[in-house]
Amino acid sequence: NRMQALVIVAHGSHLNPDASTPTYDHADTIREAGVFDEVRTGFWKEEPSFREVLRTVESDEVYVVPLFISEGYFTEEVIPRELRLEGWDLEAWDSDGTSATHATFEAADVEKTVHYCGPVGTHDAMSDVIVRRAESVTGAPEVGEGVALAVVGHGTERNENSAKAVELHADRIDAMDRFEEVEALFMDEDPEVDDVTEFFETEDIVVVPLFVADGYHTQEDIPEDMGLTEDYRTGWETPAEVEGHRIWYAGAVGTEALTADVLIERAADAGADVGDAIEEVRRKTRTAGTNGDVDADSGADADADADAGAEAGD
C-alpha cells in the first residue's frame, strides 16, 4: 500500500498572521481524521515555500490541493512551476474556468507522483461551507427562511474566474430554495457590495465573502463599504443596522471549519483513499461550530499582493 500525502498550498502573508491560520486549522482537522499518512502545508509568502514543500513529504503519492478561491495566476502558473510538475499544461485540467478537478504529473526532482487538484473555491461542496458560515454567524442551524444571502468576491478586473466562482455558488445556493433571496455581489464592479441594501427586499441579510482568509478586504474594506462602521478599527455590530436592514457579516468563508471537508473532497475526487473522513469531518465541524469569529481587530494586511488578489480571495 503506497503512502499517500495531502499537501495544502496557500498564499500566506509576511505581514498578516491571520492569512495562514485557516490553512493550519484545516490541516489539523484533516490530520485528526487520520486518512492521510502525512498532511503538509506550503505557502507563497511563508515557510515552507511551494518550492520546498514536496521535500518535506515522504509519501510517493501526493495530493496537492490549492487553498485558493479561483483558477488563475497562482493555480495555473505559480504553483505548477514551483512544484516542478513535469509537462504541466493548462489543457490537462480541461477547465472552463471553474471546472478543474485534477491532473496527474511526476515531480521528477523528488520522484513523486503529484495529483494536482483544482482550487477549493470552485468545488461544489464550497456552497455548503457558505451556508454553514451563514449558520455560524447567525447562530441559527436552520437559517434561511426570511433571510437573504449575499456572496461577495472581487470583480472580474483582476481575474475573470474569480467572479465566475462567486456567481457559481450564488446560483447553486439559490437553487437550494433555502434563503429568501441570494445575490452575488462584488467589490469593484456592479452589483457592488457598497450598495448591498439596494439589492434585497428581505430585512435580514447575511453577507459571506468568498475569501480563504481574513485580511484587509474582509476586515477593513467590506465592513466600511457596507456602512457597518465608519472605521474598521472600532469594530461593528453583528447584526448591524443599515438603511432599514440587519446585516449579519460573516467574515471570510475559508475560516469556517467545514472548509476542511472541501480539501478532503478535492483529494478524493483525484483518487485519494479517504475512508469515511468526509462524513467524520462534516460531523465534527458541525459540533465544533465556527473557528472564524467575526472580529474587527485582525489587523491590516498591507501586503496587498495584487496578483494573489482575486484568487486567494485577498
Predicted segments with their positions:
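Extended amphipathic ligand-handling, pore-lining, and cofactor/metal-binding catalytic surfaces
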Residues: 1-314
